[in-house]
Amino acid sequence: MLFSPPLQRATLIQRYKRFLADVITPDGTTLTLHCPNTGAMTGCATPGDTVWYSTSENTKRKYPHTWELTETQSGAFICVNTLRANQLTKEAIQENRLPALAGYNILKSEVKYGAERSRIDFMLQADFRPDCYIEVKSVTLAEKENGYFPDAITERGQKHLRELMGVAAAGHRAVVVFAVLHSAITRFSPARHIDIKYAQLLSEAQNKGVEVLAYKAELSAQKMELNEPVPITL
């Protein structure tokens, strides 16, 4: 994924009201950005960090600038736009960069499924193969080289795991993909210290046939690409 037009650089002043952030540009202008991330963003929003933002061509938007990446003062890149996790995963599947998800010729997005009336991020289909249901999660919480999900209690994430267990029980392929969007992370675990129920459900889901995968994105202010498998400890 190439950023076109190129991202612009600023310095973070503060994030507030979850969806807003104030930054100062190199010429001293103060801007308010849209922050497309409802999570705690622990370690991703420290005042003084470098922010890379995109600008919408839609002149009717109240906040036309969107926070895409954080470049921390230690040099790590973090993609804070949670929408990018799905886009990167879709691109990687279509370009056959994820061998575990190769061999399908149809990809559908936002398909309704499950007893709790959810929408799956992606469904893959091919002749003579079970349908493959994929839920994608964005991983940005880092403690040293360890990456964790979630960064706050997620009842929605718990629901998705229950739904995937139902998919597996019905004979389909069920997959959760953790998209690691922090350059300092080298391994992944569920965040038991934040949401013990989610961690327990993830282990249960794996035991009941749900595949748990994690891939890391190469991140820069110019482009992003999801391709590197990451070790998982449940």
Curated annotation (Swiss-Prot):
The keyword Methyltransferase does not apply. Pfam families: SfsA, SfsA_N. Transmembrane segments: none annotated. GO terms for molecular function: DNA binding. It comes from the Bacteria. Keywords: DNA-binding. Residues 201-220 bind DNA. HAMAP family: SfsA. NCBIfam families: sfsA (TIGR00230). Binds to DNA non-specifically. Could be a regulatory factor involved in maltose metabolism. Belongs to the SfsA family. This is Sugar fermentation stimulation protein A. It comes from Salmonella typhimurium (strain LT2 / SGSC1412 / ATCC 700720). The gene is sfsA.
